[in-house]
Amino acid sequence: MTFKIHNRPETKTIQTFDIPESQVLTLSSGHQVHLSNPCNIGVVRVELFWASGSYHQEKPYVATMANDLLLSGNEHRTEFEVIEYLDYLGATHRTECGHVGSSVVIRASKKNILSVFKWFIENVHAATYPENEVESAKLVRAASLERQQKTPKYWSSRIALESLYGKDHTLGIHGDPIDYQKVTSENLNLFKKQHFGLEKMMLLVSGDSDDQLLHSFADALLPFPGTPLSIIQEQFTETFPQFEKPLMHPVDGTNQVNLHLAKHIKPKDQQERFGLTLLNLVLGGYF
């Protein structure tokens, strides 16, 4: 079948969404809040954010495990009891740990969000990383990493980062399953004390929020007076010493990250490119 030129789909210019800027407020407790445009949907999303991540760890996986196991229990409650009450309130949560930032995101109905928030604050503050929970997490994560290391996807990503940044660079370094066995409950408690204190976080709030809810959050945080976040100009310049700020390339409708990588990755010679292409075809066809 032959398509005429006038039947080809039209190319459309990519346009950004017209989203209102978030408000930046400071609660009476001293904590900074980034508040998105409120909307009447009956659900509230709250993100507890710390300006600390894998950049600050001294051992592999300490930051990730310290963040993921914040609700693993304490001297008064087990992990099951902590999560059971969240389920009762109909709340969901997830954790994220990046290079220079970590967060816990909670979602709940507006009528329950304050109870959920107080429960989170109480249990995050009291978290002690029980030995049994830490050991279970280490076994599961080490087994998961072993499975990942049997795939070409893992190794292509790892080799690319190690080649781009260097094996000893914070963005290029990778751990192995055996490194999980070196993480202890003491390591996690120390990292939490240094980096995940409630006084060191800020909040990002979206959904069905209002002034009364923010005042209630502030009251819950009064025992932990907020301090300014130490975000990371020094860390950024150390990570990318050749740049004082991110570069933007004037090409419309493109991914700036991909452009940056394409500009700075050393090109391969023809023979090496052919070998990599052949390897990719073989592995891609096999897996």
Predicted feature residues:
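Residues that act as N-cap/strand-start positions at coil-to-secondary-structure junctions
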Residues: 17-19, 87, 243
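M16/MPP (pitrilysin/insulinase) zinc-metallopeptidase core fold and M16-derived inactive scaffolds
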Residues: 45-107, 150, 282-286
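Generic structural motif
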Residues: 11, 22, 33, 91-95, ...
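Broad gene-expression machinery/nucleic-acid interaction feature
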Residues: 22, 43-45, 101-103, 200, ...
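His/Glu-based metal-binding/catalytic segments typifying zinc-dependent metallopeptidases
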Residues: 31-54, 59-60, 228-287
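Short, ordered beta-strand-loop transition motifs
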Residues: 17-19, 27-28, 96-100, 251-253
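Charge-rich, well-structured scaffold segments of protease-associated domains
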Residues: 1-7, 26, 37, 81-232, ...
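N- or domain-start disorder-to-order transition segments that initiate the globular core
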Residues: 2-44
